[in-house]
Amino acid sequence: MDKFEVFAVSVAELQRASESDGAVPKGWIEQSPLGRVLFKEAASKRSRITESRSDWTEKVTSELSQLLVLPAARYELADLIETDGTKVPGSISVDLLQAGDDRRIPLQELLEQSIPSYDQANDYQVKNVIQTLLDTEVKLPPNYEVPDGIKDGADMFVGILLLDAVVSNEDRHDHNIEIVQRANGELYISPVFDNGSSLGSTETDRNRSQTSPKQYSDEYSISFFDGQSSDITGIEAFKQAAELRPEAARVWLERLASIKPEQIQSIFDRLPDNRITTEAKSFATELLDYNRTQLLKFRRELIVSEQDLTTLYQQYFQNTQSLGLAQVKEIAKAALVEKV
């Protein structure tokens, strides 16, 4: 099986700018085989680059996004060639700018406009994000394919949360979800980007050996979203979104269900051996499999529309008029298992 290509970019062309305010050194390269790209080093400290790194995670998540048909930045593995010939491993992402785009707006800015005295610690909630996207009429990104049934930016946000839940992304804060304002004033949600803190990539092999993927997902994969009474995991954040946008949640879960385990394994098998340790690969694949299993269990329980309930009522309960809707829902969950 062919390994993923590793692109070479020159440090002489690297323009370190305001993008370097994150934890990992990065900078723009205006001309590359893929056009304008953002290079990001594999780790914040080069001494940790063998075990804790984000380059392979960005590539894996980029490939998973394609399988989900979720609009996302294209990521490729890359080496930054220093003036002395030293290779600095990292990743490149293709510039998301499109013709007609005016400016990119951090989600935080929209939330501040919608919520008086917005405070990320308390107000960065799934319900607030969805309501803000709806109130501001944020659309889907142009020139990208999405699954049938995904209609607007709020629906795509549900897909972003699904991706984050699958890969245990712990860094989906209100600055790495962006809204793009077009020259005509329209707003659309940006294709997803910045997935480096996923699949346990920041852990050492020693920590991976001492933590089961289940424990990591259930206890340590805490999202940025506020759960009011307690922190919530990425899976819990997606479930909250599913309550508010059940039709969109069903579409994204169906996409997840359509992905075969061998397709996921193929992505990991194509990573060059010097980009990921054996322990990291094993931990990441088991973590992804656990998260996927948990989400597909939830899919079997999700009743997504009143139309489904009406159909089931007519099919199974037309002679039992005394049943209330709540009772129908409980019985319908079991009846819908094979349907969904």
Where in this protein do the model-derived segments appear?
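Conserved kinase catalytic-core segment
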Residues: Q131-T204
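C-terminal catalytic region of ATP-dependent kinase domains
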Residues: R53, Q66, R182-V340
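A broad, structural surface signal
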Residues: K59-L67, D155-L163, E286, T293
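Active-site-proximal structural scaffolding
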Residues: S54, E58, M156, E170-H173, ...
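Active-site-proximal helix-loop-helix substrate-binding element of RNase H-like nuclease domains
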Residues: Q113-P141
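Generic structural hydrophobic/aromatic packing signal, biased to beta-strands
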Residues: I29, F39, Y75, S93, ...
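Conserved ATP-binding subdomain of kinase catalytic cores across diverse folds
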Residues: M1-D119
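Short alpha-helical "patches" and their helix-cap loops
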Residues: Y75-T83, H173-A183, V304
